[in-house]
Amino acid sequence: SGNWAEDDGNIALFIADNEQLEAAAVSKDILLKISNGVEPHDICILCKQKPQDYASAIIEELEKHGVRARIETGYQDLIKEPIVDLFIKFMICADSRKHPNEWTFIEELLVELWGISGMRENDTFDEMQRKLSAVVNVVKKNIQQKLDTEQWHSTLNSIIDFFGIGNIKAKFPAYKQGTYFMNVINQFESLFFEEYVAAHGVWNLAIENFRGDHSVPIMTIHKSKGLEYNAVYFIGLEDSAFWNFRNQPDEDRCTFFVALSRAKASVTFTFCKKRTGMKCPMQRHNAINEFFDLLQRPGIAEVKRFQNR
């Protein structure tokens, strides 16, 4: 990472005639890495512009082979929310008591939210533990049956009511602003339920899938700040993705090197000659040709071409 040295890892440039060839090549490469022991969540697909415009064919191709790739737009910020972190930890405890770290986190947060003195011996603490066990058992009973949207809604509300909306907002002042708190809750409620349905009601799998434990994340370069992955695929090294290059060359060069620095072992750039879903389907790399010159220098990148037969 950082400044790329030749022995830092593998760099490749895939040049494809169309999205289907690009998707097949990228998917095959990802599947090979997974078969060699790389976890899906340690592989990342990056785009300069909207991921759905560049990665849809790849998502479909991977799905055919049982690998899920997920555009992280809705999930990424949500997972960092304190209230979502609390929900997830609470649901982990409801699913199984074999998670002492999550259990301790919830107890300590309750002590703070309810203003209990931290003495574990006192009666108030014992009372809190009893109430916590009771509500955890109710949630456990709920999640052991197949939930519909209404039951899921009331289960979530019972967790919120237990901690207390006022207490939560006092602890996390950002939630006092307008409808922000309810927006976060509603977003979590619908996204998590989607995962729950997709996991056929298997609770711990729904939690893992919501966290992205088993999927290949897809995001913009901008959203990848501070993250590192074993393998990175930058989809769309094309003029139309870097449409403002002439006005902001330094910023866009930085983007190119950020893609390199996200990767621990390998980075692959793709250029697709024709993207049918785009306003201008035919793609070029005239404006950003310096990137191609760099990648095509001897010893830098392995260049592979995928052409219509």
Give, region by region, the residue ranges found by the protein language model.
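A short acidic (Asp/Glu
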Residues: 51-59, 82, 229-230, 279-280
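C-terminal accessory regions
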Residues: 129-146, 238-309
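Conserved helicase core region in the C-terminal RecA-like lobe
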Residues: 191-247, 251-262, 266-274
